[in-house]
UniProtKB/Swiss-Prot annotation:
UniProt-listed SUPFAM superfamilies: F-box domain (SSF81383), RNI-like (SSF52047)
Keywords assigned: Leucine-rich repeat, Repeat
Native source species: Arabidopsis thaliana
InterPro entries registered for this protein in UniProt: F-box-like_dom_sf, F-box_AtFBL13-like, F-box_dom, FBD, FBL60-like, LRR_dom_sf, LRR_FXL15/At3g58940/PEG3-like
Listed name of the protein: F-box/LRR-repeat protein At3g59210
Disulphide-bridged cysteine pairs: none
Keyword Repeat: yes
F-box domain location: 6-54
Length: 484
């Protein structure tokens, strides 16, 4: 038997070993330098460098001076050992104690080495200016900058001709909307944009305009103000995730290619207080804002997720809910302190809805809660559910509170669905319980519910430990929509 048969790893070429080491953090890869002389500097030649010194286990413990010096020396040494070798990916995560005078040379070094994937997660305690050369790289394909309380950027000339993915967390644009517009115009092939904790509520107007963009994620920082004007001119975006205070107006909302969207628009505390006052004084609730134009711009979406804040906003800040002709999959998030007032009109506006998902069923009972639930006990009243095209109904977080009264409310709501949704073919309940008998009991109770649902309606009750499936008995199926 030759030596290579005995030691397969050591017989591999250096470039292949470097690829293997790239799957480890640089700190872990450095441990292989103890194996032999051949391995001594091999870890520094890997194309992907990952430096992580964040105190993830005990974030309250500050980095000691000795550790800081050791980390800085380690990064300096690795970059020096690489010489002029190309860097494919550079990821840096460091907390308090690592100053910008240490970080900036590392960033500039990687840019000189043609880095294509740059990820920076630096100290949240420092308010620092990011080197302008980061936004003038001809090699960057992916750029990620964070975390919360991230850097300030003053953009003069943006030139990122190859950048396809951009993720910014808490980055402050010194020139506001002008700087943001410069950034977008300097990324001619950008396909994916993610902006987290963006504070744009002080801008005169907020606009995202790109003909190339395909995925857009926008989470705006919580604020006591409403954006004055928000526009989206993104005709090729297929995925849109948006969380923000409702804007005063939406002059342009262009999502011609939209397939999937997640919307989390909310009112400010002042708007909520005004809405409660109007509700107490008048029988009819007056609008305190208007989200109609935003909804009109996304009404061709196929898959939609609405947060509980959005449900409240649609009730108080939307004059008309447009028709969602293409919508086939809708997810609704519920909150025990917020009602379902906007839900009936929303469901009536989804003529081709096939799958309806409730992320929790507990909600606030009000005298305008609508005809979707049983809050007012109107058992014989006409319900929008009676004309629902939904074939698949999913209930998430069932039994989450582990409270008997809440469980009874949830069960009554599910029974209401079965009794009124004529096209239902599948009911799936995700039960938050580790006790198998709980699932058996719920499944048995649902088998006794008179229903207008399809004769072949299948009921599934699922937990982490067990999955029960059954079909409604023919004797309990209501003919011609007659309610027992």
């Amino acid at each position: 038997m030759d030596d290579c048969s005995k030691d397969i790893i050591n017989c591999l070429p250096d470039n292949l070993l470097c690829q293997i080491l790239s799957n480890l953090s640089t700190k872990e890869a450095a441990l292989t330098s103890l194996l032999s002389k051949r391995w001594r500097y091999l870890f520094a030649l890997v194309p992907n460098l990952d430096f992580d010194v964040l105190p993830s286990l005990h974030p309250e413990v500050a980095m000691q001076d000795q550790d800081q010096t050791s980390f800085i020396d380690f990064v300096d040494r690795v970059l020096k050992l690489r010489g002029k070798d190309h860097i494919n990916k550079f990821s840096l995560k460091c907390g308090d104690g690592i100053e910008d005078e240490d970080v900036f040379p590392w960033i500039l070094n990687t840019l000189r080495h043609g880095v294509s994937d740059l990820s920076l997660h630096v100290s949240p305690s420092l308010v620092y200016w990011l080197p302008s050369k980061v936004f003038a790289s001809k090699t960057l394909v992916r750029l990620k900058i964070g975390p919360k309380d991230g850097p300030r950027v003053k953009l003069r000339n943006v030139c990122l001709p190859k950048l396809k993915t951009l993720n910014l967390d808490s980055v402050v644009f010194e020139e506001g909307k002008i700087g943001f517009a410069k950034l977008l115009s300097g990324c001619p092939v950008l396909e994916e944009l993610s902006l987290l904790n963006l504070a744009w509520d002080r801008w005169d107007s907020c606009s995202v305009s790109s003909k190339i963009l395909k995925r857009l994620t926008l989470y705006c920082a919580h604020s006591s103000r409403n954006p004055k004007s928000v526009s989206f001119d993104t005709p090729n975006v297929v995925y849109f995730e948006y969380s923000d205070n409702i804007a005063n107006k939406y002059p342009k909302v262009n999502f011609d290619s939209l397939v999937e969207a997640s919307i989390g628009i909310r009112m400010t505390k002042v708007q909520k207080a005004n809405a409660r006052y109007v509700s107490d004084v008048d029988e009819e609730t007056e609008m305190v804002g208007n989200a109609t134009d935003l909804l009109m711009g996304i009404c061709n979406v196929k898959t939609l997720y609405l947060s509980y804040d959005t449900l409240e906003t649609l009730n108080l800040c939307c004059q008309v809910i447009p028709v969602f002709n293409n919508l086939t999959h809708l997810t609704i998030e519920s909150h025990p302190e917020l009602g379902w007032e906007s839900l009936p009109n929303l469901l009536k506006s989804c003529p081709n809805l096939g799958t309806l998902v409730f992320q929790g069923l507990l909600h606030k009972a009000t005298d305008r809660c609508g005809d979707v639930c049983m809050c007012q006990g109107l058992e014989n009243s006409h319900s929008c559910l009676s004309s629902s095209p939904v074939k698949c109904l999913k209930i998430l977080k069932f039994g989450e509170t582990n409270d008997d009264d809440d469980m009874e409310i949830e069960m009554e709501q599910i029974k209401n669905f079965l009794e009124k949704m004529p096209n239902l073919e599948q009911l799936i309940i995700y039960y938050e319980s580790s006790i198998d008998n709980d699932l058996v009991r719920v499944s048995s109770q649902l088998q006794e519910v008179p229903t207008v649902a399809s004769l072949k309606c299948k009921i599934q009750v699922i937990s982490d430990n067990l999955s029960l499936s059954s079909t409604l008995p023919i004797s309990l199926s209501m003919e011609n929509g007659f309610h027992l």
